[in-house]
Amino acid sequence: MMHRGYGGDRRGFRPSFRSDRNSRYAPRTRREPQRYDPMPELAPVEFQKNFYQEAESISRMTPSEVSSFRKTNEMIVKGTNVPHPIQKFEEAGFSSEVVSSLVEKGFSEPTAIQGQGWPMALSGRDMVGIAQTGSGKTLSFILPALVHAKDQQPLRRGDGPIVLVLAPTRELVMQIKKVVDEFCGMFNLRSTAVYGGASSQPQIRALHEGAEVVIATPGRLIDLHDQGHAPLSRVTFLVLDEADRMLDMGFEPQLRKIIPKTNANRQTLMWSATWPREVRGLAESYMNEYIQVVVGNEELKTNSKIKQIVEVCSGREKEDKLIGVLDNFKGDKVIVFCNMKRTCDDLEYVLNRSGYGAAALHGDKSQNIRDKVLDDFRSGRRPILIATEVAGRGLDVNDVKLVINFDFPGSCEDYVHRIGRTARGNTKEGISHTFFTVGDKANARELIRMLREANQTVPSDLEDMVRVSNDRYGSRSTRHGYDYRGRAGRFPYRG
């Protein structure tokens, strides 16, 4: 028996209109993403590297004046024929439009690393820059990179980038791209970012459309290069930003695969906060007669403009102490660093319930949510950012008044970079407040050294921690993988 409106096939009853092409039940064709054929590696083109014309005022500097400038700024240079430092934007040879833009952004003069780094980079030499976080190093390589790219032959169809900047994290990649985009239009150049954790299709499309400047994480760049979407033979200006961090994260094999694929006569710039043996080895392998500038020293050092407060306490006291600290900074931008994603989410709930505008940022967040969180933080809609190590380096937000280490990081190097999110560039002093527990004792001695070197107060409890055994301060559970509320978990975890 056939029922009205139904078909009688062996598959059972179903609406007879199911096959109607206009029916909402009809299968919908899926739109396939546009596919791009691999780009061939084209023959290299001639290029130039030296764009520096020393200003007359710089040429007149006496050796004693040069030495005095470097000594005043705690600067050491190494290598032969290192250019003299500049002290005004105009002396770098940038266009009036670039200089005006720098002034409009609130910069009155180059920072120490820019004053020495710009002449070195613009002269076409391979160079290494060692500088503390917040010193203005991003502009130290971005503006010379744009000058370099602008004065090369135009990109041909299928060419890869002229400038390649490698960075350890997608957050740092996006931050560098933001700085690049502020100046790209003045040079009539295009840039794109290549990083993991997001769809590769828009990145592939941007590479095929052509971009003179590419900022990338090593892993995603290798993937796209191997697929034929990111040829590197046109790269004549290579930057390794936070080289020490990239090696710490295990990117050395990727770096050693990427670098030989660029132009053999390229200019290479390496930037790092420290100068360990591994970074030196990488420089010796791929740089020719490089010159070096060190601002401060090659050892781990904190920014002298940051007032550092270290408070020894137990894990269970942290939450109440955090509220007490935040009460004194209402309305100010504050970054709270934690070691675990779960701690970030817990604190986000606690602080918002208490009336604070807080948002969490960690590795489980999608890129869209991360962008929204950072936009809300920058605008002040949510003035408290709670983050894991994912935001510890490269995050450049204006007017961060306070950095709180709710959890002490796994190393003092990460501590330096965390607190460096405040007092950046030529801005005034910032403050860091760190909660330190017995579980962090392994870092106590190095932390004391850095505090004393920066003329900061060393709490007596911290000194005692170095002298006595762990048993005097806490139970075994406090010293192992438990979070601040005593729950078992992996510690420290950097999301």
UniProtKB/Swiss-Prot annotation:
ATP-dependent RNA helicase involved nonsense-mediated mRNA decay and ribosome biogenesis through rRNA processing. It catalyses: ATP + H2O = ADP + phosphate + H(+). It comes from Encephalitozoon cuniculi (strain GB-M1) (Microsporidian parasite). The gene is DBP2. One of its GO terms (molecular function) is RNA binding. A motif (DEAD box) lies at residues 241-244. Residues 305-466 form the Helicase C-terminal domain. One of its GO terms (biological process) is rRNA processing. ATP binds at A131, Q132, T133, G134, S135, G136, K137, T138. This is ATP-dependent RNA helicase DBP2. Residues 1-38 are annotated as: Disordered. One of its GO terms (cellular component) is nucleus. Residues 1-35 have a biased composition (Basic and acidic residues). Its EC number is 3.6.4.13. It comes from the Eukaryota.
